[in-house]
Structures are given as C-alpha cells and as structure tokens.
C-alpha cells in the first residue's frame, strides 16, 4: 500500500498563495515609498536611511495599534479596502501627538486561510493610509494560521516609527492655565467604541449591516466603516509655524480619558459641550441605547478626533490656518486650574 505524502498545503498553509499575494501588493507598497527607503519588500527586514543632516538631536518615536472590533463590521459587510486606512491612522495619529513626523510603517495580518485578493484589498487601504500620512510601508508579516481564526476572519496590527527633534518633543509640560483647546472634527466613530456601537445598533436596534440608519441616509456599513481621519499633514503644518503645547488623539476612553494624558499636574480641561456639532450617529446611539452622557464622552470621540492645546494669543491664527487646510475645527474649551484630587475634565 502506497504511503500518503502530506504537504504544508494539506495542513492549511499555502506558500504559493502567499507568494501570489506579495506580487499583488508590490505596486501598492511602491506607491508609499520615500527617498530614504533602501529596499523593496520581500527581505527579512525593511531598510530606511534616516538623513541625519536634517536633524540636530533626532529622537525616534514608535507606536503600535489595531482597529479592534471594527473588523467585525468589515467581515459582515465583506468590505476590506478601507480598514487598512484605520490601521495606519490609529498608529500615526498616536505618534504625531509628540510632534513626530511619521517615517515608516509595518503591518501584521493574521488569518486562518489566506485569500490573496482579499488580503491585497486590505493592503490597498494600508497603502492609502500611508500615502495620506506621508510615511513608507516598508514591510510586514502575513500569518496563515489554520484553526486559529473562525471562517474568513482575520486580525491586524500596525507599527509606525517617526522622528522629532529632541527640543521639539511635545509632552504637555508647557501647558498653562488659559491655553485654548481646539478640536479637529472626526469622520465618525473612527476605530473606537465599536463593541458598544455593535451592541446598540445590531442587537438593540435590530439593524442589519446593509440596513439604513434612521435619519442618516446611510447604511450601517457606510456609516460605521467610514475610515478614521489621518491628521498628520495638518498637524505637521501647524507645528512648523505655531506653538502647540499639547496634543491628544481621542481614541478609546474618549475626551474624558485622553485629554488628561497630556495635562500637567494642577491643570484641568473645561470643555464646552455645545461648542461643536456632534455627528448624528452619536445622538442616534445615545438615544437608542439610553446611554448616559458621561458614558458617551468616555467611550466615543463624539465628533472630535484630535485636540490641540495652544496659547490663547495664537488660537485665532491657528483656526484660520486650519480652515485653509480644509480642517473643520472648533475651539471647544480651555485649560483651567485644578485642585488636587479633582476631576481633570469638566463638561459644561
């Protein structure tokens, strides 16, 4: 009796599919390239030559993140071409809050069975995000792990590295009482709060992924899969000409948890709730889920994706510049004195 020969493909890992995928994404990767990139993808590591002549004391800033359960909605809608934008946004928006220019990005994609076309669609979004952020996609890892994930599901992680002059690191230490808080509009939920959003919209409201959201004129998929905004170019533009004392990326924890991360001791943020237009999706969820206001501001960005802390005397010029950059911005509050043991954010 002839012995059966077992291959890696029989075990669920298709090396040929992986090679096909790499060839499919090469043009997408090339579209993100910068002059400092020294090699194409496919090597064991990405090579990036930092131009030391541009800096006096360069400091590298790194960040890593994922997109959480927003992926579940991508699975339901079978839409995968924008989720990569979210991945890049979550990472680069984190490192620009310290004043760092994003230089390069790497991604990790894990799935039970690799579908080259779907994976290439995902990387299309990653490439688009890198183009928006001005950083190069220099490498990544695609892990095919049979039996580890359910059906066609996958998970993603991203890794960004940027650079900032040591003397220009933004750490919030120069924030003072009287500084103004400027909020940059979000595009929707971005990539946080989706576990609660799914519970309210899919379970409590009983809507399907292709159903219309009442009063929005959009389907659940269209609204909830809107890509996270990437603020890199606007923020870097401001940093060249203005004093920005602090920056907060409004992610998990919302305004209530993220703004305090950049405030020095003795300071609090006073936020005027009626100073910006809260997108309707947040009002729909709050009403349908009977969600308390504090819970909304502690879970979602509520329409503000990035907060700048700036000197009062520069706030007007900064708002004018932001308008010229096509940013929708609002003066949402100010920094005030905070007594020890008190809350760091007041909603008024």
UniProtKB/Swiss-Prot annotation:
Alphabetic keyword roster: ATP-binding, Cytoplasm, Ligase, Nucleotide-binding, Purine biosynthesis
Enzyme class: ligase
Gene3D superfamilies, A to Z: PurM-like C-terminal domain (3.90.650.10), PurM-like, N-terminal domain (3.30.1330.10)
InterPro entries: PurM-like_C_dom, PurM-like_C_sf, PurM-like_N, PurM-like_N_sf, PurM_cligase
Catalyses which reaction(s): 2-formamido-N(1)-(5-O-phospho-beta-D-ribosyl)acetamidine + ATP = 5-amino-1-(5-phospho-beta-D-ribosyl)imidazole + ADP + phosphate + H(+)
Top-level taxonomic group: Bacteria
GO cellular component terms attached to this protein's record: cytosol
GO biological process: 'de novo' IMP biosynthetic process; adenine biosynthetic process
Pathway: Purine metabolism; IMP biosynthesis via de novo pathway; 5-amino-1-(5-phospho-D-ribosyl)imidazole from N(2)-formyl-N(1)-(5-phospho-D-ribosyl)glycinamide: step 2/2
Signal sequence interval, chain numbering: none
Family statement drawn from the similarity comment of this UniProt entry: Belongs to the AIR synthase family.
Protein name: Phosphoribosylformylglycinamidine cyclo-ligase
Species assigned in the record: Citrifermentans bemidjiense (strain ATCC BAA-1014 / DSM 16622 / JCM 12645 / Bem) (Geobacter bemidjiensis)
Origin organism lineage: Bacteria, Pseudomonadati, Thermodesulfobacteriota, Desulfuromonadia, Geobacterales
Gene this chain is encoded by: purM
